[in-house]
Structure formats: C-alpha cells, structure tokens
A protein has these predicted regions:
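Serine-hydrolase catalytic machinery in alpha/beta-hydrolase-like enzymes
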Residues: 24-121, 221
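Alpha/beta-hydrolase fold nucleophile elbow
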Residues: 122-133
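Gly/Ala-rich beta-loop-alpha elbow adjacent to hydrolase catalytic centers
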Residues: 132-136, 140
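A conserved short beta-strand
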Residues: 149-159
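Short beta-strand/loop motif that positions the catalytic acidic residue
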Residues: 177-179
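Acidic catalytic loop of the alpha/beta-hydrolase fold
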Residues: 182-186
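Short alpha-helix in the alpha/beta-hydrolase fold that links the catalytic acid
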Residues: 187-197
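C-terminal catalytic histidine-bearing segment of alpha/beta-hydrolase fold enzymes
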Residues: 199-247
Length: 247
C-alpha cells in the first residue's frame, strides 16, 4: 500500500467528480498527533467512521472512503497509530496493534477522539455507523462493547475475539459481520463463539460467511483478494448503511 501523503493530489482530482474533496486532518488525542482523512458530499450527509487495518491509514482506506462519499456519506478514516506511523514490516505492525490490544482504554480513547474530531468537521455522529478491516474490525467490536452511541457496527474479515472480562451488554447498535470461511487467521470457531455471545446478549446482528474467501479478501491487488466476496460484502454493507442511517 502506498502512503497516505502520496495520494492526496489524485484524491483531489477524483473528488471533483462527485462534488466532494477529501482532505487530511491532523488532530490531537491526549497530547499525541494523529492524521486522518475526512470527506463529505454535503453538510447533512449520514456519517461513517472507518477504521484501518494493521498497515495504518493508507490509500486503501482512502479509496473506500471516497467510494462511500460517492454514495452520499460523510466519512472520517481515523488513525490509531499516530501521524506518520504507517508500518510496513510485520514486526512493526504487530508492535503497534499489540500495544492497543494490551491497552483497550487507549484504543477506546482514540476512537472517541476521532469521533469528536469528525463532529468538529461537521459530521453528524448521532446518525453514524462505524466499520473496519482486520485489526480495524477488532477495534469496531471494542467500540461496540464500550456502549458507544452509534447506529451500527460492521466488520470485514475483522478480529472477533472478546477480551476476558468484556461482553456486549452495553452495545447499542446492530452488528454486521462479514467473514471468509477460508480465513485461517480468524477461525470459524471464533465466528461461532461471537454469534453465541451476541445472541446471549440480545444484540441485533447479522453474520455472513463467504465460501473460499481468505483473510483480507477485500484488499484490492492483494494475493488473497477475492472479487466475488469483495463485491458481495460491499453490496451488503452499503445496504446496511441505507437500512440503518437516516438519509
């Protein structure tokens, strides 16, 4: 994936086509700088918060944000690692994600800070859905368990395990899980266990599997990309947005 700074000129050109131009947003959470990406086609657009995978915020998330803006949604792609931190080595990716897995309160604070930043840019965070990929999917479920007042939580090939001592008793919005049944990183046993937890907690949820799809099946150009599963899951996600948000 290319770095976020590499694609801003291209993004400004593509944004003109649908009347919205995205921009980098530098913001602070607890004294540390973060760099997200915000795009909105109108002042009253429903809002979507996007959480990146373990590569950090790159052109992949920006492309997804622009795709949603074309459909009429305001999108803030947040940053969980820090301004300029876009790991490319496996050990660095594990380090940055591991730090947040070990410090769930920090993870929650960063997501809250991102929502506050989006609100300051004009986003309607009371009419909002959050979604994420891989590590970002795990963060989405962390936000759901925190009791965040959002209308929906969606994950693509995201982490599904619930940390010890946590549950979904405070979850407010509906949960949508999209998972590859050939994913060896996040197993079907974990998928099944999450289904049991959500059912027990009485959380409205929908969980979909895609046959033959491996982990990261939505990543364009990746060696595990599966076009059919990507298109089907994206279609279902956009339907979920239309069903969940006030347009």
């Amino acid at each position: 994936m290319r770095y976020i700074t590499y694609v801003f000129l291209l993004l400004s050109l593509t944004g003109v086509a649908f009347g919205a131009t995205g921009a980098s947003v530098t913001y602070q959470v607890n004294g540390q700088s973060y760099e997200g990406y915000y795009i909105s086609p109108s002042d009253r657009a429903p809002f979507v918060l996007l959480i990146h995978d373990w590569d950090g915020l790159t052109d992949y998330e920006i492309k997804r944000a622009n795709m949603l803006a074309e459909l009429g949604y305001a999108v803030f792609a947040l940053d969980l690692f820090g301004a300029g931190v876009r790991p490319t080595e496996m050990k660095d990716k594990r380090q940055h994600t591991g730090e947040l897995y070990k410090n769930r309160e920090k993870m929650r604070a960063l997501m809250k800070g991102a929502l506050d930043t989006a609100k300051s840019k004009g986003a309607d965070i009371k009419n909002a859905v959050v979604f994420g990929y891989c590590f970002g999917g795990a963060a989405v479920l962390e936000l759901a368990r925190s009791g965040a007042d959002l209308k929906g939580f969606a994950t693509f090939h995201g982490g599904l395990k619930t940390p010890q001592g946590q549950n979904y008793s405070q979850t407010r919005g509906e949960i949508l899980i999209m998972h590859g049944s050939a994913d060896t990183a996040i197993t079907m046993d974990q998928f099944t266990e999450l289904a049991k937890e959500l059912e027990s907690a009485g959380v409205a949820h929908e969980m979909i599997t895609y046959g033959g799809a491996q982990h990261a099946f939505t990543v364009f150009g990746g060696n595990r990309y599966q076009e059919a599963a990507d298109k089907k899951s994206w279609k279902r996600f956009t339907e979920f947005l239309a069903e969940t948000l006030n347009n």
